[in-house]
Structures are given as C-alpha cells and as structure tokens.
C-alpha cells in the first residue's frame, strides 16, 4: 500500500547462539547476547576482557579495576542485482518477479566496510532526581576503522571507572559504509525558489495513481 513508501526496509534482531535449535536461540536471548541493526546483516561481538575470563555482551560483572573491552564488527554482504536461481518454474519465477520487483536477497562474496565504531556510556542515577545530562555520554568514544573485508576490531578501557566508583553500562554502535535504500524519493516534491515542497506526486500504488518510470516497487 501507499504507506509502505514511508517505511524503511525493516530492522533486524540478532542473537549469538551455540546452536540454531529453538532452545539454543532462547538461551541466547536469556543471556542477553543480542543486538539490533537498521536492516543490514552486520556481525557484532562486544566482550569484557579480564585476566581469567571473557564476558560476552549482555553480561553483568562486578569489578574493582578499570574494565577492558574488545569489539569486533563485520559488515554485511553487498548485494548482487536480481534474484538467484531458485529452481522455480517459469510461472513461479514470473510471480516472484512481480511480487519483489525482480530484486531478492542475493548476497555476493564481498562485504561492506565498517567505517567506525562508537561507544556509548551510561551511568545509572544514584537518586531519583539526579540530572541525567552528564550521565548519558553519547558518544563517549569513537574509533575510526580502516577498510577491510575482515571487519574492524578495537580494544579500549574505561580509565575513570575505578576512580568514579559508580556502576556503568556500555554499548556500541558499528557504522557501516553507506548503501542504497529503497524508495528514497517517495513524495517526489515540486519545490519553490526557497526550497519548500509545494506539491507532491506520490509513487504509484495499486490502482489509485498512475505509474511512472521513477516508481520503485517493494
């Protein structure tokens, strides 16, 4: 429907598992070894490193020393145009092409680069009315990454943790190189001299509007 022109291609939830059984997946969720992306299938690991043990993302650990973290992120696969050969009949292939506009999940062997990794640090309140402006550091640290098919791996420490004597929560964002999105010109505005949208020509949808070569079908 027309409203779909305003939506993104959808986010993804990922979970680290020891096996792909139902129980294995639920165990990963219970252990909070999870992360989300805005859609690309990015691989991400975020570990707390100690002298005796490694704790994965989602862990809660009591420490007296400054924590040391390790992050690794690998970009999603670049997509090849069209659809792979699913071995379907001619009729099924025609129907598939009509449904998805001839574009499927069709990964190549080349991955997108991770351009940087951002670290966010949150310090929980000590009392209900404590101002939160200084407690949420977004972003706290930024690490630029070199282009690599092996992804990006960094290690860092919070040198203020022990001195501050307060609990802290850390999470990371892996930023992938830009990629094309679907239906980015859905309203197709006509602009005045000041750059204001004065008229729209919404993308073709079902039987309500006429299609044009610029239309993108999902």
Please give the residue ranges for each predicted region.
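Short coil-to-beta strand junction motifs in C2/discoidin
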Residues: 85-117
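Short acidic/polar inter-strand loop motif in beta-rich domains
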Residues: 176-187
